[in-house]
């Protein structure tokens, strides 16, 4: 079964491909099939993920899965949330994972409350007008470190410390990260939903 991943993020694609492989599902990055990205005008992860999934399904005629994920920092009242990917741009930096981490560390200097949640919402649709989308959510609580730690992963992985594991996501072996990350948790739920409802 082929499913479009409604993302151009190669890090997400690699993570999700590895986790979906046992199902016999081939995930194809939308950028390999068409140009352009869905608008993400909403203030919740689930609405943006649904918008992206419907857009990719409409453009390709294939089932689609979209992820909308982000960091919700306690000190910032849950922000940056759905604007996580563009976090650094409000501080004059060009959009990139590296600049996002730099901006976050700068903004968190001297802040005692370092609690944060990483949230991932996956939405799957069989077609652009699917009335019954699959929805899976994963959430992990952690703390923002004061400096980068580790070289694995992408995004905020080098500064997202998980106390019960004693490591940042960037310090973890990929298999450990998949088992404990927000995206890993949401993906495991989505795999079960796809297995139950889409794979025959």
From Swiss-Prot:
The keyword Ribonucleoprotein does not apply. InterPro entries: dITP/XTP_pyrophosphatase, ITPase-like_fam, RdgB/HAM1. The active site is at 68 (proton acceptor). CDD domains: HAM1. Binds 1 Mg(2+) ion per subunit. Substrate binds at residues 7-12, 69, 154-157, 177, 182-183. Keywords: Hydrolase, Magnesium, Metal-binding, Nucleotide metabolism, Nucleotide-binding. It catalyses: XTP + H2O = XMP + diphosphate + H(+); dITP + H2O = dIMP + diphosphate + H(+); ITP + H2O = IMP + diphosphate + H(+). GO terms for cellular component: cytosol. It comes from the Bacteria. One of its GO terms (biological process) is purine nucleoside triphosphate catabolic process. Mg(2+) binds at residue 68. One of its GO terms (molecular function) is ITP diphosphatase activity. It is an enzyme of class 3 (hydrolase). Its EC number is 3.6.1.66. Its cofactor is Mg(2+). It holds the Pfam family Ham1p_like. Belongs to the HAM1 NTPase family. Homodimer. Pyrophosphatase that catalyzes the hydrolysis of nucleoside triphosphates to their monophosphate derivatives, with a high preference for the non-canonical purine nucleotides XTP (xanthosine triphosphate), dITP (deoxyinosine triphosphate) and ITP. Seems to function as a house-cleaning enzyme that removes non-canonical purine nucleotides from the nucleotide pool, thus preventing their incorporation into DNA/RNA and avoiding chromosomal lesions. This is dITP/XTP pyrophosphatase. The lineage of its organism: Bacteria, Pseudomonadati, Pseudomonadota, Betaproteobacteria, Burkholderiales.
């Amino acid at each position: 079964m082929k499913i479009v991943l409604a993302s151009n993020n190669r890090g997400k694609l690699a993570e999700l491909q590895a986790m979906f492989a046992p199902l016999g599902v081939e995930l194809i990055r939308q950028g390999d099939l068409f140009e352009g990205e869905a608008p993400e005008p909403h203030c919740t992860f689930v609405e943006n993920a649904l918008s992206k999934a419907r857009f990719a399904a409409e453009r390709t005629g294939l089932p689609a899965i979209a992820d909308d994920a982000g960091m919700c920092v306690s000190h910032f009242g849950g922000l940056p949330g759905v604007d996580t990917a563009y976090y650094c741009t409000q501080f004059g930096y060009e959009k990139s994972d590296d600049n996002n981490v730099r901006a976050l560390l700068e903004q968190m200097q001297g802040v005692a409350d370092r609690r944060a949640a990483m949230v991932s919402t996956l939405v799957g649709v069989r077609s652009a007008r699917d009335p019954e989308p699959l929805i899976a959510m994963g959430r992990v609580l952690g703390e923002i470190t004061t400096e980068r730690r580790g070289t694995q992963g992408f995004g905020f992985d080098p500064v997202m410390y998980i106390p019960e594991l004693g490591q940042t996501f960037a310090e973890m072996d990929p298999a450990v990260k998949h088992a404990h990350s927000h995206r890993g948790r949401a993906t495991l739920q989505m795999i079960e939903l796809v297995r139950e409802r889409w794979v025959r």
